[in-house]
Amino acid sequence: MTDTEQSIGTTGATGTDLPEFPMPRRPPFDPPSEYARMRVDGPVTRAMMPSGEPAWLISGHEHVRRILADPRVSSDRTQPGFPSIVRITDEQRRRMSGFGRSLIGTDPPEHTAQRRMLITEFTVRKVAALRPRIEQIVNERIDAMLAEKHCDRPVDLVKELALPVPSLVICELLGVPYADRDFFQGRTRVLIRRSTPPEEREAVSEELREYFDRLITAKTADPGDDLLSRLIEHNRETEVFSHELLVGLATLLLLAGHETTANVIALGTLALLEHPEQRAALANDPNLAPAAAEELLRYLTIVEAGFRIATADIEIAGATIKAGEGIVALGASANRDATAFGRPDELDIERGARHHVAFGYGIHQCLGQNLARMELDVVFRTLFRRIPGLKLAVDVGDLPFKDDAFIYGVYELPVSW
């Protein structure tokens, strides 16, 4: 163990000199500068969470993958001591909304049964069948951008393309009325903002729960041709989900299905605009779009970390994580690890970046990753072909970055051509 590791509390559990987590990102694209030092000095170190409790930060690519695949870690957010970047009481943990107990917040065998019910809806083959509709949606949104530009003012790419594309896709897939987008998009913004007071977070979660409670009840009585209806019908036979879990799962799928991809589209477009040689390579060979999507997922890593709690003592990188201690697997650090990616701080759309951990790793790896990849592929191969003169309409330093959110991105992206 190095002196630096000791100074930041690798072995201490309650030291007052622990660094605080979360740490500020470096806009527009880079993770906190502290991560690079951690990877060198000690890829398994301790930090203080907003709750006032310490947790283990895992920063190396190898170590992040190892911890996320370890059966001795739990994703059960209701456990006391589970790390969180918002203050939460044990009573609030017990009253967590349904999506906290569905899929992302469960362990085997409960998690296994839930995932098995859903995985067939997101296979490569199933997602490939959606491609024509995704292409149609992307082209329609670009048509709208081109029409709006007749007014000779900048167009907000977030509002006109990045958010509508995945929102409409996931709404049609789930069977959620797209007309309700202002309701769920607005409440998603509240939930992912770190500074949202606990009372407001609970109130918004309850509004979403009530919305999906009504939707699931309606689909139970009158099923349609959509994922939620198929899930309800299948559940009649298997009884894997309670009604409350179905409500929570629907909430999770909708929120995760539009917010994450929307931010990669917007921030990825900005990254390509700020790296003209990479944009030119993509324009010259649109078949680079899938590789570009993987590299942008790695380079940007908009979801900073995955949170777990140890259920048994774990030895890793010379440290002992004891049962009951919180763990923060820093995907944003792992994806900039030079031992896994050459020149990790450079954007290179021709590198092989498929082994990134932007979608997580292990049994909780993102269920909708094939859909996200398809959406990113279609957007990036279409946008620059149809609007070759696309450019940023303001200085990059004037953009409103989501420094205050669980999911990184930009609130607005004014573009012109």
Residue ranges and their predicted role:
Residues 1-417:
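Cytochrome P450
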